[in-house]
From Swiss-Prot:
GO molecular function terms listed in the Swiss-Prot or TrEMBL record: electron transfer activity; flavin adenine dinucleotide binding; succinate dehydrogenase (quinone) activity
Domain of life: Eukaryota
EC category: oxidoreductase
Modified-residue entries (Phosphotyrosine), positions: 207
EC id: 1.3.5.1, 1.1.5.-
Binding site for FAD: 61, 64, 83-84, 90, 92, 97, 213, 267, 432, 448-449
Annotated localization: Mitochondrion inner membrane
Transit peptide: 1-34
Species per Swiss-Prot/TrEMBL record: Rattus norvegicus (Rat)
Protein name, as recorded: Succinate dehydrogenase [ubiquinone] flavoprotein subunit, mitochondrial
Length: 656
């Protein structure tokens, strides 16, 4: 800590007079004794720049980031964890329903059945090697959380309680509804995040709290760390590391109505894009069936898992018509589309007939109080509804991004060169920021928290396999990160005609109206033009705060740049994909287009060439100067990690 203190005194001694700054800079860093830092004048004389060196740096401190960070520290790596929020403010805290694992506490279960359901739920766009890894690791991951102290809800005999959730079955879809979702009432994400944060405090990890990651530090195709802004004092920090893990979450705030926190701005996704690397499958955006009408707040799928039902204005349990077997527990894309069709056909509820109802008041009050206490409170606050007496008005709301940074099942980031996958040295991703792809075209409920802990741990294990603590950290150029500082300075003094909030709202409303639950070519084309125009309007931004101390105006503008890159790739990918698959439902291309017609026996059929079918991953790139989007494609991985232990699930017609 003596070295850190010396740097702090040096920074304070310089008394840099930045416009709007009213106090000296305070250099804040994690309390690790292993932290090293020194002041650099290589890329800016206007902004204080501090260089650090670690074995590994994790960007993001939600469930995935924390699990990766303390996994590395536990293995002896000198680890930094950089986050724009205090860890327990991360969006993982908002997850309600639970975490899937085939524990078999309610009935016989098998992780291979979970594997089957996840592949089917992905509409056969998920990579089966990664799905194999995740579902096989699920039971041990939940037991690990229990050992960390996570207070799971319990059965009467003391085992972890498991509820029913959408798209989950027994015996490869032939044995009825599975009860596979482990939960802590309806506050599972809150409990998981606090459990992981508490566990992380056992280890010597350096936390850089309220630091905004600006860009990756890339050298010769390798990632060698990140450059970040300290929001507290405006200092710039280059964190050099042999390995970098991106765990920054999703980009739900590209849409007007969503369940995501305002901080879900796709920061990691955008950093990868600016580094010239691809993003994968961003057109697949999950609409959760039950957001509170008018507010967008999440009402967990656990409500339907506990016996809640969706009804229309005629009091009809309409899901029986769309999914005769699973009914209200069909997969999320199926339920969201069914609700939208009910509203379109005039059976919506309310004066405007523009929503449906989620009915819970037929359930015992004691069940609502013990299994769904948070929902009872949320419904009263945001809808004015007493769930023991009235139904909750609900509407599909943007909830999750299936796409993200392409990785393999070890968390290593991939690029696609000459038709082949290549690993990007030194770069990993996990959580919602990543696309492994375990969710494919549609994520099953309660697989997201599982994704976080399984692949956060996988990143740490993968690094421990290939590196050793104290390995030499590769050098970076003296001016590495210079462009990031220039961009920050440009935005800080931006004096155009458009407020950040105005441009952000225009983007969100455009995405909401042009790339919603149902999509059509002409509307998507119009959306592409509109979002491209809005991207161009970034040149006309006006920021008002010229200071550097807690400049939230500047941070929101940096976040808007990130959101725009995500929005561009989402809508261009959606316009190009001329089929319906999972969460991507085209009204002008209503069927799934595979290499074979799986509604018929494939014997005698000729396999479609790769260019003529859509069972493939979209790879998107953006020229950040012009906003031009370029698309490429890579094949889906159908083989599991061990065919003898877990057989591939061949594509089939998907019904519930």
């Amino acid at each position: 800590m003596a070295g850190v203190g010396a740097v702090s005194r040096l920074l304070r001694g310089r008394r840099l007079a930045l416009a709007g700054a009213t106090r000296g800079f305070h250099f804040s860093v994690g309390e690790s004794k292993k932290a090293s830092a020194k002041v650099s004048d290589a890329i800016s004389t206007q902004y204080p720049v501090v260089d650090h060196e670690f074995d590994a740096v994790v960007v993001g401190a939600g469930g995935a980031g924390l699990r990766a960070a303390f996994g590395l520290s536990e293995a002896g790596f000198n680890t930094a964890c950089l986050t724009k929020l205090f860890p327990t403010r991360s969006h993982t805290v908002a997850a309600q329903g639970g975490i899937n694992a085939a524990l078999g506490n309610m009935e016989e279960d098998n992780w291979r059945w979970h594997f089957y359901d996840t592949v089917k739920g992905s509409d056969w766009l998920g990579d089966q090697d990664a799905i194999h890894y995740m579902t096989e690791q699920a039971p041990a991951s939940v037991v690990e959380l229990e050992n960390y102290g996570m207070p799971f809800s319990r059965t009467e005999d003391g085992r972890i309680y498991q509820r029913a959730f959408g798209g989950q079955s027994l015996k490869f879809g032939k044995g009825g509804q599975a009860h596979r979702c482990c939960c802590v009432a309806d506050r599972t994400g809150h409990s998981l995040l606090h459990t992981l944060y508490g566990r992380s405090l056992r280890y010597d990890t350096s936390y850089f709290v309220e630091y905004f990651a600006l860009d990756l530090l890339m050298e010769n195709g390798e990632c060698r760390g990140v450059i970040a802004l300290c929001i507290e004092d405006g200092s710039i920090h280059r964190i050099r590391a042999k390995n970098t893990i991106i765990a920054t979450g999703g980009y739900g705030r590209t849409y007007f109505s969503c369940t995501s926190a305002h901080t879900s701005t796709g920061d990691g996704t955008a950093m990868v894009t600016r580094a010239g690397l691809p993003c994968q499958d961003l057109e697949f955006v999950q609409f959760h069936p039950t957001g509170i009408y008018g507010a967008g707040c999440l009402i967990t799928e656990g409500c339907r898992g506990e016996g809640g039902i969706l009804i229309n204005s005629q009091g009809e349990r309409f899901m029986e018509r769309y999914a005769p077997v699973a009914k209200d527990l069909a997969s999320r894309d199926v339920v969201s589309r069914s609700m939208t069709l009910e509203i379109r056909e005039g059976r919506g509820c309310g004066p405007e007939k523009d929503h449906v109802y989620l009915q819970l008041h037929h359930l015992p009050p004691e069940q609502l109080a013990t299994r769904l206490p948070g929902i009872s409170e949320t419904a009263m606050i945001f809808a004015g509804v007493d769930v023991t007496k009235e139904p909750i008005p609900v509407l599909p709301t943007v909830h999750y991004n299936m796409g993200g940074i392409p990785t393999n099942y070890k968390g290593q980031v991939l690029k696609h060169v000459n038709g082949q996958d290549q690993i990007v040295p030194g770069l990993y991703a996990c959580g919602e920021a990543a696309c492994a792809s375990v969710h494919g075209a549609n994520r099953l409920g309660a697989n997201s928290l599982l994704d976080l802990v399984v692949f956060g741990r996988a990143c740490a294990l993968s690094i421990a396999e290939s590196c050793r603590p104290g390995d030499k950290v590769p050098p970076i150029k003296a001016n590495a990160g210079e462009e990031s500082v220039m961009n920050l300075d440009k935005l800080r003094f931006a004096d155009g005609s458009v407020r950040t909030s105005e441009l952000r709202l225009s983007m969100q409303k455009s995405m909401q109206s042009h790339a919603a639950v149902f999509r059509v070519g002409s509307v998507l084309q119009e959306g592409c033009e509109k979002v491209s125009q809005l991207y161009g309007d970034l040149q006309h931004l006006k920021t008002f705060d010229r200071g550097m101390v807690w400049n939230t105006d500047l941070v929101e503008t940096l976040e808007l740049q990130n959101l725009m890159l995500c929005a561009l790739q989402t809508i261009y990918g959606a316009e190009a994909r001329k089929e319906s698959r999972g969460a991507h439902a085209r009204e002008d291309y209503k069927v799934r287009i595979d290499e074979y017609d799986y509604s018929k026996p494939i014997e005698g059929q000729q396999k479609k060439p790769f260019a003529e079918h859509w069972r493939k991953h979209t790879l998107s790139y953006v020229d950040t100067k012009t906003g031009k989007v370029t698309l490429d494609y890579r094949p889906v991985i159908d083989k599991t990690l061990n065919e003898a232990d877990c057989a591939t699930v061949p594509p089939a017609i998907r019904s519930y």
